[in-house]
Amino acid sequence: MAIFLYSLASFTHPTAAMLLMGIFGAVTMVRYIRKKYKKPLVWTQRARRIYVAGAVLCLLIGFAAMMIFGGDILERRLYSVAAAFTACYCASHIILMAANLLLRPVEKHINQGYINDARSRLASMPDLRVVGVTGSYGKTSTKHFLHRILSEQFDTLMTPGSFNTTLGVVRTIREYLKPYNEVFIVEMVAKNPGDIREICDLVHPEIGIVTAVGPQHLESFGSIENVQATKFELVDALPESGAAFVNDDFEMIASREVSNVQCLRYTCRDERGAQWQAVNIVYTPSGTDFEVKGPEGFSIQLHTRLLGEANISDLLAAVAVAVYMGVGADRIRYAVAQIEPVEHRLSVKRTA
């Protein structure tokens, strides 16, 4: 309606058109400020750069309109600018997209500076042990479980929240990694082939966990085989002295041969030659009791408040890596018992 009234006024009286546009803009701004959003916009440095670039584009469009259509009459010039700004407002999403596109070389240069700084920080910590975690699902839970167990013996940092892309990992390194950290657990997500390899080239993990290979993000990967290849970029990047822990409960993992590094397979469902197994799983009112069996006759009886095979599988991976890294059985047993279930996810509810 506002655009219709503006168009009508612009043909009858340009000054009225500009006044109408000003009123409409002011009302829109007030509504924007007072509106409550579920997740408000965070004004990061990049967001500010995009909005400034968008404003500059609007000014340039307004100036061009004035020069082309304004002529020598002041009122026509003002009308041309008002019309241009109205068009910019209606196409604000296109303006911001164009600003983002124009800033791409600048953002690339800035991001590369952040990456170089992160590399330098990692290079200054040669004794830091890096564990990579990836998978179609289960990687976040495994990351948290492993962090809880390793923290019993090591000063351990994990990538927080959804900081699981290259730049998210870079931000974690620059803002959270401290010289006294001993272990760095890196969750790695991928939407395209090469994404995990890029993160590995940055952090150089010595241990890798592949929790699952499933039909996730097929719109970008194209096939389950490409998903498998991308998840195993983590395993392919490990040094010969490292170790890969892979979940043989998934056929696309069990069928994948690994020859470049020691490969330790784990399973909750059947043996299938896996080195690590969760057996004798019993669900109780207080959680789950189960036994973990590993190489060289290793065995440990555990109790957790968690429920469900998926949680036990993720716990199994975390326990296997912890044992590999030298965490004692008593510390593992205590940490596993202390892990809290995620709210609304297979947690026990007691009623009167």
State where each predicted segment sits.
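Phosphate-binding loop of NTP-binding sites
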Residues: A2-W43, R49-D248, M252-N260, L316, ...
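Acidic, Mg2+-coordinating active-site environments of NTP-dependent enzymes
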Residues: V210-A352
